[in-house]
A protein has these predicted regions:
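Non-catalytic accessory regions of SAM-dependent methyltransferases
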Residues: 1-46, 53, 61
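Conserved AdoMet
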Residues: 2, 40-118
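Conserved SAM/SAH cofactor-binding pocket of Class I
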Residues: 107-212, 238, 260
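Helix-to-beta-strand junctions that scaffold the AdoMet/dcAdoMet cofactor pocket
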Residues: 175, 221, 247-249
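Conserved Class I SAM-dependent methyltransferase catalytic core
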Residues: 230-293
Length: 295
C-alpha cells in the first residue's frame, strides 16, 4: 500500500503538491478537487497565496512541517472538511476559526453580506441582528465593515457550542465590544421594534433530504444547522413571524434560502405583511436570497 505523501523524504513543495493530490485521489477524491485541496492546504500552512506557491516550489520542507502535513492529508482523505482540518477559513474580509461546533461558512453567504452592505437600509441602520449565527460569519463580517460607526450588532444561536465559537471569533477580530451574543431560539427574545436589519442563514433543508447530503457534511457538520423541518421552511417561517415584532418600521429582513424556495419565500413574506420583497439568485443562477421590509 502506498504511503501518505509526507512519508517520502526529502520533500519539496512541488513534490508534496503532486504526491498529496495523488494520495487524495487514491482515497476517492476527484483529480481536480484533490489538486485544489492540496494547493489550499499548502498555501495555508506556508502562509502564502495560491499564486505564490510556485515561488516556493523547490523549498525543502522541514520534518516537523512534513509530519503536520501528513496528518492533515490523512484527515482530508478520511472525509473531514479542509476548513476543519486547517482550523481557520477566510470569509468576506475576515478570517474565522472553524471547527465542528458550527456550519462551515460558504461563498454564497458572502454574497448575502454584500447584499446587506449595498442596501439602503444599511446606510441608516443602527441595530443589526443575526439569527442562527454559527461561526459568527455574517454578523462579524458586517461588524468589521462597520468599524468606526455607531452600529451595534446582536448574534443569536440555539447551540451553546456554536455561540462559543462565534464569541471566540469576535474576540480574535477585536469586535467583542460591538457584538452582543444571546443564547436563544430565533428572534423572539429580542426587544420589540429594536432592529433595523434582521439577517439569517437558517437551516432550510427538508428533514427527509438531510440524510442525502454528502458524507463529508453528514459526518462532520452539525445536523441542526441543516435540518429545516418537514418542508425546510419551519425556521424561516418563525423568523418571518418574529421579524414582524422585532424590526423597526421600515426595517428589513434578509435571508439565505434553498434553491427551490424562492416562490414560497416570496409568498410567506408578502402574506406576513412585508413590502418590497425581493428573491435573488446566487452566482450559480439558483434562488438563494430573499428579503423584505416591514411597513
Amino acid at each position: 500500500m502506498k504511503t501518505c505523501p509526507s512519508e517520502v523524504t526529502p520533500l519539496t513543495v512541488e513534490r508534496l503538491l503532486e504526491a498529496g493530490a495523488a494520495y487524495l485521489c487514491r482515497h476517492g477524491m476527484e483529480e481536480e478537487e484533490a489538486q485544489s485541496q492540496a494547493r489550499i492546504l499548502l498555501s495555508e500552512v506556508l502562509h502564502c497565496s495560491l499564486s505564490a506557491l510556485t515561488l516556493h516550489a523547490q523549498r525543502v520542507l522541514e520534518e516537523a512541517l512534513v509530519q503536520r502535513l501528513r496528518e492533515q492529508f490523512k484527515r482530508i482523505a478520511s472525509g473531514e472538511p479542509i476548513q476543519y482540518v486547517l482550523g481557520t477559513w477566510p470569509f468576506h474580509n475576515i478570517q474565522l476559526r472553524t471547527d465542528a461546533r458550527a456550519l462551515i461558512p460558504r461563498p454564497e453567504t458572502e454574497e448575502l453580506v454584500e447584499r446587506i452592505l449595498r442596501s439602503e437600509v444599511w446606510k441608516r441602520a443602527e441595530q443589526i441582528a443575526d439569527i442562527g449565527t454559527g461561526t459568527g460569519a455574517i454578523i462579524l463580517a458586517l461588524a468589521h465593515a462597520a468599524r468606526g460607526t455607531n452600529k451595534r450588532f446582536t448574534a443569536v444561536d440555539l447551540s451553546e457550542a456554536a455561540l462559543s465559537l462565534a464569541q471566540e471569533n469576535a474576540q480574535a477580530l477585536g469586535l467583542s465590544d460591538v457584538v452582543t451574543f444571546i443564547h436563544g431560539n430565533g428572534a423572539g427574545g429580542l426587544p420589540a421594534c429594536s432592529c433595523d436589519i434582521l439577517v439569517s442563514n437558517p437551516p432550510y433543508i427538508a428533514t427527509a433530504e438531510v440524510n442525502q447530503l454528502p458524507a463529508h457534511i453528514l459526518d462532520h457538520e452539525p445536523r441542526m444547522a441543516w435540518d429545516g423541518g418537514a418542508d425546510g421552511l419551519d425556521i424561516l417561517r418563525q423568523i418571518i413571524l418574529d421579524g414582524t415584532q422585532v424590526l423597526k418600521p421600515s426595517g428589513r429582513l434578509f435571508f439565505e434560502i434553498g434553491d427551490e424556495q424562492g416562490l414560497s419565500m416570496q409568498r410567506l413574506l408578502e402574506r406576513a405583511g412585508y413590502a418590497d420583497v425581493v428573491v435573488a439568485r446566487d452566482f450559480a443562477g439558483h434562488h438563494r436570497y430573499a428579503e423584505g421590509s416591514l411597513l
